[in-house]
Amino acid sequence: MAVNLLKKNSLALVASLLLAGHVQATELLNSSYDVSRELFAALNPPFEQQWAKDNGGDKLTIKQSHAGSSKQALAILQGLKADVVTYNQVTDVQILHDKGKLIPADWQSRLPNNSSPFYSTMGFLVRKGNPKNIHDWNDLVRSDVKLIFPNPKTSGNARYTYLAAWGAADKADGGDKGKTEQFMTQFLKNVEVFDTGGRGATTTFAERGLGDVLISFESEVNNIRKQYEAQGFEVVIPKTNILAEFPVAWVDKNVQANGTEKAAKAYLNWLYSPQAQTIITDYYYRVNNPEVMDKLKDKFPQTELFRVEDKFGSWPEVMKTHFTSGGELDKLLAAGRN
C-alpha cells in the first residue's frame, strides 16, 4: 500500500514538473507586401521578446509571407489563414471586408493614423553622379531619359508612382487635364521595362543596368542605394509628392479561428511604440511620431505631400477610373504607342 502511494506521489510530482516546465507557444502569420522582408525581419524579434516577457514566457513565433499585396490579399480570400496583414495599399485590406467579410467595415478606425503605423512617398534612384541631371518629375519626360518601375496593373508601388506623377503634373499645369494627359503619355512612354513587382524592377535597374531612373518608395530606393553601395546610386526626392500609407489589420475571422487574437492585436499596436517606430525609420520609412522624426530631419527631405483621396477621390474610384481595363492607364499607354 505504501509502495503504491509512493508511486502515485512520484507520478504526480513528475506530471507537475512537466506542466511547470511547459511553455505555451503562439504563432502568427504576417501577410505582407513584396519589399518589406528586411523591415519585418528587424521588427519581429524584439516584439517576440517583449511578448514572452509580458506573457509568462509564452514563445511567440512570427512567420512572414511576402508578395505583391494584391496577390497576398487574394491568397487570404482563397483560404490562407494569415493572422495579420501589413500591406502598401488600402484597397488590398479593404477587399478582405468587401469580398470575404473577414474584417469589419470600420477596420481603419481601430488603430491610429487610419491604421497606418508608417508611411512613405516616392523617390528616384539615379546612377552615380546623376548624369541625366534628374531633380523633379518634369525631368522624367525628357526624350533622353529612360524609366524603370513596375506595372501599375500588378504593383501597388507602381500605382503610387503613377498617381504621384499625375498629381505633380496636375499641380504644375494648373489643373489643365489635357496638359496632364500629355505629360503622363510621355512619362509612360519613357518606361523601358514594366516588371510585375518592385523587386523585379530593382533587378532590372541595378543588376541588368537598364534605365536612367528607378522609381519606388523612398524607403526602397534608400535601401537599394545601401545594398548596391559600390555602384554609387543617388536618391532624389521630388518637391511635390504623394502620401503612401501602409495599412495594417488583424484578420478577425482568422485570429478567432487560430486563437491568436490577443497576440495579433498586441503586435500591431506595438508597431506604434517608440521602439518600433525607431526601427521603422532605420529602413527609411516615415512615421507620425514627432519625437522620433524631429531627430531625423536630415534623413528625410522636406516634400509637399498630397493624399490620394484629396486629389483623386476614394481608392475604389481611383481603381475604376485609372487601373481597370480600358481605364486612363490603358488609354495613355495606347496614346504613347501612336
Curated annotation (Swiss-Prot):
Keywords (A to Z) from UniProt: Periplasm, Signal, Sulfate transport, Transport
Gene Ontology annotations of biological process type: sulfate transmembrane transport; sulfur compound metabolic process; thiosulfate transport
Locations listed in the record: Periplasm
Principal location: periplasm
Keyword Transmembrane helix: no
Subunit-structure text: The complex is composed of two ATP-binding proteins (CysA), two transmembrane proteins (CysT and CysW) and a solute-binding protein (CysP).
Protein name: Thiosulfate-binding protein
Upper classification of the organism: Bacteria, Pseudomonadati, Pseudomonadota, Gammaproteobacteria, Enterobacterales
